[in-house]
C-alpha cells in the first residue's frame, strides 16, 4: 500500500447526476430522482489530456450517469486542507455491468468516508475499499485496508471504445479475471499497459472518465 509522504487522507462522498442536455428532463416513475437532473458538459473545463485518436472517450453521452467525487486532503503537514470536486462520467452505454455495480455501491453509501489507499504518481490513484476508513487519527486504518470489498464480484467487461487514457476510471481486481468487486482507480496519465490487448492476463476494465477536477486527481497522485 503506497501513500505520498505528507498526505493526510482523502475522504469522499459520491452523488450521482445523469448526463443530459442543458435542460432538465423528467425521470421515469421507477427510476431514482437523480436520473431527472440535467447537466451541461460545457461547464466542465478541468479535463484530462486525451489523445485525439480516442475521440469517442472525449464525447459525453446523454443518459450516462455522472458521479461527483468530493475530495478533501492536506498536501503537506503545514499546508491548508484542500477541498474539491471531481466529476466522472460512467459509460453505461459501453460498460453496463461495471457501471451498474458502481452505481449500486454509490447508492448504498459504501464509499462514504473512504480514502484512497493506493497512490502512485504518474500511474493510478486507487480507492473503493470500504474498510479503508480512518480509525482514530489518520493514517491509522483497519489492517485489512487495501484488500477489502463486498465479497460480491462481477465479470471482467471490455469494450473496444474504452482504454486507459489519462483520467480513465478502471475496475481493480485480483489475479482472477472475474474478481472485480468495489475497488476502482483513476489513471494519472495514459496507462495503456493496463489494456487487455497489451497484457496476457485479460487486462483491466475501463468504465468511466474524469470530466472535471483532474487537477485534484493529479495533486492527490503526486
Region roles according to the model:
Residues 1-26:
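Secretory targeting signatures
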Residues 22-222:
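Cyclophilin-like peptidyl-prolyl cis-trans isomerases
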